[in-house]
Amino acid sequence: NRGQRAFVLTLQAREQHIRRQKATSNICSNQSLMALFVTMYCSLMGRQGLKEAAGLSYAGAHYLCEQLVATGHFTVVYDRPFFNEFVVRYDGDVDALQRRFVEGGFFGGVKVAPDQLMFAVTEKRTKEEIDKLVELV
């Protein structure tokens, strides 16, 4: 003990946390493991860190949405408040756009309809990265 904080799952079957393809039983939900990850993240970030991460996610998503609409190729599908995820309609070939994003080093949204993409922005994305993604449009 060096006075360092540690997190463990006590009395957990190891098989619960291996890949589903390799498991020999159906106990693969990983709920306990995900709960541990959330606990670790929240405790490491602290109250102020969580608030900052949420603010960065919100600001980044709204900035990306505004920039995409400003290209003239996107319209917002749901005209409602959002946190860090939003859906836009693209006036071009969505599959070709996604290929450009991948070639540029981005996972550029989830295709939710033939002409629609859902984007999510987290605190890890910078303004420069968002601008680079928009340039690929």
Residue ranges, per PLM feature:
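C-terminal alpha-helix
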Residues: L136-V137
